[in-house]
Amino acid sequence: MSFVNVAPQLVSTAAADAARIGSAINTANTAAAATTQVLAAAQDEVSTAIAALFGSHGQHYQAISAQVAAYQQRFVLALSQAGSTYAVAEAASATPLQNVLDAINAPVQSLTGRPLIGDGANGIDGTGQAGGNGGWLWGNGGNGGSGAPGQAGGAGGAAGLIGNGGAGGTGGAVSLARAGTAGGAGRGPVGGIGGAGGVGGAGGAAGAVTTITHASFNDPHGVAVNPGGNVYVTNFGSGTVSVINPATNTVTGSPITIGNGPSGVAVSPVTGLVFVTNFDSNTVSVIDPTTNTVTGSPITVGTAPTGVAVNPVTGEVYVTNFAGDTVSVIS
């Protein structure tokens, strides 16, 4: 007994490619049509004989090309019909087999939450949903769904005894989004004979980087995020701070004018105030996030302050002084 393995989609693709070849042949025939009647270059016998020879060859070419085109059309028709026939036969064969597979998987799925045979479902993109586990005996883990903005991608599903773990979903569109974890290798149920473990899927890539441009940016140095509101960017070259709306990633309002050479910036999780180090004026400016205006007078610290951080428990502010080799503490 002999068997033939056919992929109907590949047969249909081959038929389409063959049809394009036929189109190219017809184009070539049209271009060569003028060679069937070649005019003599002069009235002498030699020129007339050469023209007749070329014209004869052109006529023979057209005759052969017509036969090739006719054969090619029949070949494309046969290939297209074969693809359709194979597709119908495949669909007819798949239905009863799927019914048998459903009958086998139903009790296993009910008892273990996982089928015996079959691939796990992919997680829904934009939700960070984990991919489904593959079947106990055979099946690839589903891919994790991509995360929403700022959310990690979903973990890939585990493979069965035979199969590959699903790939982790990509993180949401934030530069620090965490990638989804890879799907676990397959393993046999307790008491079963273990087969070769499935290969864990690769973790998804981190989220894509979004570039924000604005006229107020002038040698931007530091950036800090207010957990309950805006993003603050220091512009060293213009002595200002730009405010970004994280919902739209666009600059909002006018730049906030502060000291000279603003460098570092930090937000207090205790008070919500924004602290900015002014490198050239040896001070720290404080911004009220509710009004986005400077509050009070600049606080004098050491020479050339750069870095700044806020203690999340006490609210104390720590400032590194680049040229003074000191650290200032603001209570």
Curated annotation (Swiss-Prot):
**Name this protein carries in UniProt:** PE-PGRS family protein PE_PGRS17
**Further comment found in the protein's record:** Elicits a strong B-cell humoral response among different clinical categories of both adult and child tuberculosis patients. Could be used in the serodiagnosis of tuberculosis.
Where would I find the PE domain in this sequence?
Answer: 1-92
Q: Which residues form a coiled coil?
A: none
Record keyword Mitochondrion present = no
Assembly with partners or alone: Interacts with human TLR2.
Q: Which gene encodes it?
A: PE_PGRS17
Family membership: Belongs to the mycobacterial PE family. PGRS subfamily.
Q: Name one Pfam family in it.
A: NHL
General function of this protein: Induces maturation and activation of human dendritic cells (DCs), via TLR2-dependent activation of ERK1/2, p38 MAPK, and NF-kappa-B signaling pathways, and enhances the ability of DCs to stimulate CD4(+) T cells. By activating DCs, could potentially contribute to the initiation of innate immune responses during tuberculosis infection and hence regulate the clinical course of tuberculosis.
Keywords from UniProt, A to Z, are: Repeat, Virulence
Induction section of the entry? Highly up-regulated during the early stages of invasion of the human blood-brain barrier.
The NHL repeats are at 217-247, 260-290, 305-331
User: Which SUPFAM superfamilies does the UniProt entry name for this protein?
Assistant: PE/PPE dimer-like (SSF140459), YWTD domain (SSF63825)
